[in-house]
Amino acid sequence: MLSAFQRLFRVLFVIETVSEYGVLIFIYGWPFLQTLAMLLIGTVSFHLWIRRNRERNSRSGKTRCRSKRSEQSMDMGTSALSKKPWWTLPQNFHAPMVFHMEEDQEELIFGHGDTYLRCIEVHSHTLIQLESWFTATGQTRVTVVGPHRARQWLLHMFCCVGSQDSYHHARGLEMLERVRSQPLTNDDLVTSISVPPYTGDLSLAPRISGTVCLSVPQPSPYQVIGCSGFHLSSLYP
């Protein structure tokens, strides 16, 4: 299992036992991949802790109804996009979506001090890394990993929010409010993907730019909705 984790995240794990019930884990590698590995380890540990407590409560005679409600609540949070938690599927980490965003656009979407970053991640079933002042002109580099449809939904939302067209801008703000307030459903993702692409809107070019890679089985990587202002290419040459 450890070697599989190291191959998946391209990091090195060094594990030392510090007590009878705990271990100390050192993770070496690219900072973003270190973060992903830590989040996955923490999430899996939390779910194992929940499962262990649920089994303990069941053995002690607690009502099955309460346990079933807790299980359904957890499943809704982890299985909205697939039968397995998305962070356990390697393909969701193979091709991060990377682009640059203006500072004021970052604040509009993620809030002052990135207040809404965590809730957007949780509700969209993705992980998002923001690197402020990544370019000489002060742009923020945004890296997104997660299921393809979730990344495509976020990309569509970013495009709409950054558009100078009043209709698309309003649509983007509606999508932004939704992902801030509640988890996305499969219906949300299907609706976003089915929206006809708006071509010819070059107003996004000075607002959002960079590399966008959405690797899914499709005839051409350029068939990404609402991206006329993006430069699309492979993240890893």
UniProtKB/Swiss-Prot annotation:
Q: Which UniProt keywords apply?
A: Membrane, RNA-binding, Transmembrane, Transmembrane helix
GO MF annotation list: RNA binding
Where in this chain does the record put each KH domain?
96-155
Q: Transmembrane residues, as ranges?
A: 7-29, 33-50
Origin superkingdom: Eukaryota
Which protein family is it in?
Belongs to the KHDC1 family.
What name appears for this protein in its UniProt entry? KH homology domain-containing protein 1
- Write down the species: Homo sapiens
